Amino acid sequence: VGGIVDANQNVHNLNSYFTLNANKKFGDFAVTGSIGNEFNSNHSFSSSVFGYGLVVPTFNNIKNALTYVPSTGTSNTKLFGVFADVAVEYKKFLSLNVKARNDWSSTLAADNNSIFYPAVSGSFVLTEAFSALKNDKINLIKFRASVGEVGKGAPAYGTDSYYVGAGASDGFGPVINFPFNSQAGFTLSNTAGNNKLTPEFTREVSFGADLAFFNNRLTVDATLYNRNTRNVILYVPVSGTSGVTSALQNAGKLSTKGLELLVSGTPIKT
């Protein structure tokens, strides 16, 4: 009657982040830049034993069970990235920012594990370029635009197919799990891996404006964006006659468009 589980999980994460920054002025131009690298190593291990059919009720010990079903799980992933960032500002009213990053992910096959994604953004402050526009009523008029990408790898071990503990059922009675009658059994997982997976990318284009009025007592922040994700990594159903029921593929696209508007005000100030 009843059951018990004895489980253990260990997680080890190692992260390092290094940057080198510099800045310099050239007349009316101010230039800042940075380069760096990032390293992430993630390891987890879990083990458990499920016991079924307790001999003595309420005696919570795994040895009190008639049958045992052991299981383990492990995950090791690594990611190494390098990046660079350069920003140029002219007379505090015109700016341009260029970024680039390249990651190498262990969750993708060696031929496809490089993930490069750049980004460019710029802004123009109208009230700084034309100081006559700036007064007690109009404090800030700023326009901005950006386009950039973000990439990521696949789920851990998604590039290969693996064997898992076997089980059987007729749909009416209880499920028979191995080991059974002192015999171990394994079967190919119902999910097929895919060593042709490529990185998943999300590109976003945005245009916006920042406005401030009446000595900054009324501010408006508006952003119009268009976000598209390609090569979405999904578990896709496949015919069971192939020996599996799903396969990991670059099979999806997502598109999002929207307007973000934030209005803040201080109607009464003492």
Provide a role label for each language-model segment.
Residues V1-T270:
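Extracellular/periplasmic, surface-exposed regions of secreted and cell-surface proteins
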